């Protein structure tokens, strides 16, 4: 009798093909959307979502030329350290000249620094601890002695 009940239950079951539920971007964790689409958001830029840019930063050091990739929201000194490049620094706050370099080509945003004056910035000096790349950039390092 048990076999009869089981066979009637199997016969009475209908198989309906279900379509997958649509996925909303809002249902994904923000980390997922960032990695999927190369997007980032943050309070530093008003909470807006912006496209992430990565630039090539070439360092001309006394030991030779070294190149790293650096996101536009990472200080060039931090990117160098992550790549194992040893560059000079002290305060890491843009308020001294230990990490000074000189931009040979390209551009950086160093609005976080408070040490260099407009004339020094105009001459191409940069504090690597407080500079974000805004394009591919080449920087001569170890320039603290050249700042007058």
Swiss-Prot record:
Tell me the tissue specificity. Expressed in leaves. Not detected in roots.
Q: Which InterPro entries match?
A: 2Fe-2S_ferredoxin-like_sf, 2Fe-2S_ferredoxin-type, 2Fe2S_fd_BS, Beta-grasp_dom_sf, Fd_pln
Can the keyword Iron be found in this entry's annotation?
yes
* Gene Ontology, cellular component aspect: chloroplast
Which residues are involved in binding [2Fe-2S] cluster?
Answer: 91, 96, 99, 129
* Transit peptide interval: 1-52
One of the protein's GO biological processes: photosynthetic acclimation
Ranges for domain 2Fe-2S ferredoxin-type: 55-145
Answer yes or no on keyword Manganese: no
Q: Which domain of life is it from?
A: Eukaryota
Q: Which UniProt keywords apply?
A: 2Fe-2S, Chloroplast, Electron transport, Iron, Iron-sulfur, Metal-binding, Plastid, Transit peptide, Transport
PROSITE patterns linked to this entry = 2FE2S_FER_1, 2FE2S_FER_2
What is the free-text note on the cofactor? Binds 1 [2Fe-2S] cluster.
**Cofactor(s) required, per the database record:** [2Fe-2S] cluster
A molecular function (GO) held by this record is:
electron transfer activity
Its chief place of residence is plastid
Where would you find the membrane-spanning parts of this chain? none
Compartments where located: Plastid, Chloroplast
Subunit description: Interacts with PGRL1A and PGRL1B.
What the protein does comes down to: Ferredoxins are iron-sulfur proteins that transfer electrons in a wide variety of metabolic reactions.
Q: Return the similarity comment.
A: Belongs to the 2Fe2S plant-type ferredoxin family.
Under NCBIfam families, the record lists:
fdx_plant
Which named protein is this?
A: Ferredoxin-2, chloroplastic
State the organism named in the record. Arabidopsis thaliana
Q: Which gene encodes it?
A: FD2
């Amino acid at each position: 009798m048990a076999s009869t009940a089981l066979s009637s239950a199997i016969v009475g079951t209908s198989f309906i093909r279900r379509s997958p539920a649509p996925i909303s971007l809002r249902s994904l964790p923000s980390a997922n959307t960032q990695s999927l689409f190369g997007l980032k958001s943050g309070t530093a830029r008003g909470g807006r979502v912006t496209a992430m840019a990565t630039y090539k930063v070439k360092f001309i050091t006394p030991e030779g030329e070294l190149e790293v990739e650096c996101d536009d929201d990472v200080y060039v000194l931090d990117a160098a350290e992550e790549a194992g490049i040893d560059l000079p620094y002290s305060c890491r706050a843009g308020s001294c000249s230990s990490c000074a370099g000189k931009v040979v080509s390209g551009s950086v945003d160093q609005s976080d620094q408070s040490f260099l004056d407009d004339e020094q910035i105009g001459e191409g000096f940069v504090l690597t601890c407080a500079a974000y790349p805004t394009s591919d950039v080449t920087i001569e390092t170890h320039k603290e002695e050249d700042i007058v």
